A protein has these predicted regions:
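Phosphate-binding and adjacent anionic-ligand microenvironments
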Residues: 296, 300-302, 323-325, 343-537, ...
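N-terminal small/polar loop signature for handling phosphorylated ligands or for N-terminal nucleophile
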Residues: 98-161, 259-314
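Conserved phosphate/anionic-ligand binding catalytic regions in large, soluble enzymes, centered on
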Residues: 47-67, 154-157, 236, 240-252, ...
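Glycine-rich phosphate-binding loop plus the immediately following alpha-helix
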Residues: 167-195, 330-354, 358-368, 421
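An N-terminal, well-structured beta->alpha segment
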Residues: 5-114, 204-236, 244
Length: 581
């Protein structure tokens, strides 16, 4: 029997378990069709493994099968989570959780399934009445003093996906030791163990009551309300890309005093099929096509777009030639943290112990700003749970004033412990108002930062490798980079190697030192003598390996920018060649 035939036989055996009466008729017929189909590709992809409850929860394609998002995989995850909560909070009279969801197909169904299972286990559930932004889920956990939370979302993944994010009592995604503890409990659960029959008496619907308190808190992060009064009619175009931002972001902007906000009509419609975009990802130009159409027609000052669960924000503005350009995640993070630092200092809100946080793959220019302004900057792993961890570690001792990552996630407050597109959109609008009040544009602010702290060009290469064979290939690539690391990148000599799996820093002369990080992570970083930085990591949520490139240069005036961009583009191609990409 060949390896492929063995795999098919194993998948068929597993699939037949899904034909039992424990599963509904629709699921059974979908599984039967896979078994009977001569092409076994669907069968293999749906059953070759169990959808893994990872450190962030679940993420996968919706459909029948053990490797798919459905009420059964969601149900087993929730039962395991409930079991862990009952062990961990055994002395608490009434455990409570918050359940939230985005606009995706089946999101409400999955959220109600989660609520039913928690309540059937004697756990009180605060269930949002409709879709809400991810940051509001985090806020609600803290505000309602719940022990945990679940958010049904797949962020900006394609429409076929859905996901399940697990939160702890501080409103952050679960970290050690609870992540491993929950995973262990989830892995013990079989479908027959799941208590699907809900207890309505333990489910409380929440909505506007939490919305109001959240919006009031978001208002408190404004640094310079006067510039908003001066520029209240700033022309803002906003799109939620059919997602949860539609509920809160226009309200947040209005509450800050912006009274000239235009929402992209076609994309204000809640729709998990995302009919107006190929991918609902504010990082990509195609998703902003309609937003740019409206921004040009209205001669707007800024365009902002949030992803389906409204935790990330993409932005566009006019350059010095009056052309609309996308501002990438690193650039937005630069503008965001530069404004927070310099303007908190200007209005006397800064304390010597205040700190900011960025992720290891985010631009090093932020380090330069922090050093020059004498502000503590911390580096952490990719993923906002690590930024939340830094906030928690310093609670009551030092004040977190802002953080962000290159993947379009930003947080300016500590009453939320996940990235927040609601507060970020409001603060970015304030920054735009500040620029206009000083006779500048957002683009001018970016150029000013490059001139003062150094030009930087960041470029991410995503190498997609779907399915089981893809996962194996990605593993092999990382193995090869470790055993045979490059010596140069596009002509730039590497002088520092960081391996976050072994937590070792290796210098070009062979000397080694240990890194102080809270955990290991499958990430490699190479630093060159000319400031070039390359980071390599497999994605935690998608079947791809990511290469983060950062190229440095000097910019004496805004007119130097095109030449810097050209040199960076040449350098990127040379680095790709060095890496065999």
């Amino acid at each position: 029997m060949s390896n492929n035939q063995t795999l098919i036989a194993q998948c068929e055996e597993k699939a037949r378990q899904w034909l039992s009466p424990a599963f509904d008729e629709e699921t059974r017929s979908a599984v039967e069709a896979m078994i009977n189909n001569d092409d076994k590709a669907d069968l293999i992809e749906s059953f070759y493994k169990d959808l893994e409850f990872g450190t962030g929860g679940l993420r996968g394609i919706m459909g029948a099968g053990s490797n798919r998002m459905n009420i059964y995989t969601v149900g087993m995850a929730t039962q395991g989570f409930a079991n862990y909560l009952k062990i961990n909070f055994k002395d608490k009279e009434q455990i409570s959780v918050v359940v939230c969801h985005d606009c995706r197909n089946n999101s409400r169904l999955f959220a109600e399934t989660v609520a039913n299972i928690f309540s059937a286990n004697g756990i009180k559930v605060y269930l949002f009445d409709d879709l809400r932004p991810t940051p509001e889920c985090s806020f609600a956990i803290r505000h309602l003093k719940a022990q945990a939370g679940v958010n049904i979302t797949a962020s900006h993944n394609p429409r076929e996906y859905n996901g399940y994010k697990a939160y702890w009592d501080d409103g952050a995604q679960v970290l050690a030791p609870h992540d491993k503890g929950i995973i262990d409990e989830v892995n013990k659960v079989k479908v027959d163990d799941v208590k699907f029959e809900g207890n309505k008496a333990l489910i409380q619907i929440i909505g506007e009551d939490v919305d109001k308190v959240y919006l009031e808190q978001v208002k408190t992060i404004s640094i310079d309300p006067q510039v908003i009064k001066n520029q209240h009619d700033l022309k803002i175009v906003y799109t939620p890309l059919h997602g949860a931002g539609r509920v809160m972001i226009p309200r947040a902007l209005a509450s800050w005093g912006f009274d000239n906000v235009h929402c992209v009509k076609e994309q204000m419609v809640k729709d998990g099929n995302f009919p107006t975009v190929d991918r609902p990802n504010p990082e990509i130009a195609e998703a902003l096509t309609l937003g740019l159409r409206d921004a040009k027609a209205l001669d707007a000052d800024i365009l902002m777009a949030s992803d389906p669960d409204a935790d990330r924000v993409g932005m566009a503005c006019k350059n010095s030639d009056g052309e609309w350009v996308l501002i990438n995640g690193n650039q937005t993070c630069l503008i965001f943290l530069w404004y927070i630092i310099t303007n908190r200092q200007a209005v006397g809100k800064m304390k010597p112990t205040d700190f900011i946080v960025k992720t290891i793959v985010t631009t090093e220019v932020i380090r330069k700003i922090a050093e020059k302004q004498h502000v503590e900057m911390r580096d952490c792993y990719t993923g906002f749970k690590w930024i939340a961890r830094e906030i928690a570690l310093s609670e009551g001792k030092q004040q977190y004033i802002g953080g962000g990552e290159e993947s379009y996630g930003f947080l300016a407050e500590d009453f939320v412990r996940d990235k927040d597109a609601v507060s970020a959109c409001a603060l970015l609008a304030e920054i735009c108002a500040y620029a206009k009040d000083h006779g500048k544009t957002l683009y001018d602010i970016l150029m000013d930062i490059y001139m003062e702290y150094g030009y930087s060009h960041e470029f991410t290469i995503n190498v997609e490798r779907p399915g089981k064979s893809g996962a194996d290939e990605i593993q092999q690539m990382m193995k090869n980079f470790r055993s045979n690391p490059p010596k140069e990148l596009g002509g730039s000599v590497i002088d520092v190697y960081k391996d976050f799996q072994s937590l070792e820093i290796t210098k070009a002369d062979g000397s080694k030192e240990k890194m102080d990080m809270p955990d290991t992570s499958n990430v490699l970083q190479w630093f060159c003598t000319d400031g070039t930085k390359v980071s390599v990591r497999p994605s935690g949520t998608e079947p791809k390996i990511k290469f983060y490139l950062e190229i440095k240069d000097t910019m004496n005036s805004a007119s130097d920018f095109p030449a810097c961009e050209q040199r960076a583009a040449v350098k990127i191609e040379a680095i790709k060649k060095s890496l065999g990409l």
